[in-house]
Amino acid sequence: MAYLLDTGVISELRKPHCDPGVATWMAGIQPDEAFLSVLSLGEIRRGIELHRPKDPKAAGALERWLLGLEAHYAERILPITTAIADRWGRLCLSQPLPVSDGLIAATGLEHKLTVVTRNGSDFQRSGVNTLNPFS
């Protein structure tokens, strides 16, 4: 089985006191089963830039973490392809979704991945399989 981690799950893994359910679930899968969307990387980058003016040191730490994610997941970072964009466009006609959730759902559907998220209800209408590892 293969999984698409949403931003909330990726961010949880960085916490010093990560949710035990998330930590246990992540330890139970093979590294090559976990994928990221470029959208999650963009959301993390946005968070870094929002922090930078207020706390440059924290922004620097987050940036190093992001670079580590990019290196670790290198071949498992999924772009928005024309096929994904097409699927997203079709999904949105029948099931209006926020853009990023819709594109993540379309990515999961296109690659036959289960979206790992705390917010399964955000994706329910899309038909993508979801998993909530939080305790």
Language model region names:
Residues E12, E43, E110:
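Acidic-residue sensor for enzyme active/binding pockets
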Residues E12-L13, W25, G47, R87-L91, ...:
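Residues that scaffold the ATP/ADP-binding catalytic core of kinase and kinase-like folds
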Residues M1-S40, L50-G68, R125:
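Short, well-structured N-terminal submotif of metal-dependent ribonuclease cores
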Residues R46-H51, G60, A71-R118:
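Active-site neighborhoods of divalent-metal-dependent phosphate/nucleic-acid chemistry enzymes
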Residues F35, L78, L131:
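General small-molecule cofactor/ligand-binding pocket signal
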Residues V38-L39, T81, N119, F134:
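Residues at the C-termini of beta-strands that transition into short coil/loop
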Residues M1, A105, L109-S135:
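Acidic, PIN/NYN-like endoribonuclease modules and their adjacent C-terminal/linker elements
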Residues V9, S40, I84, L103-I104, ...:
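Alpha-helix capping/helix-boundary segments
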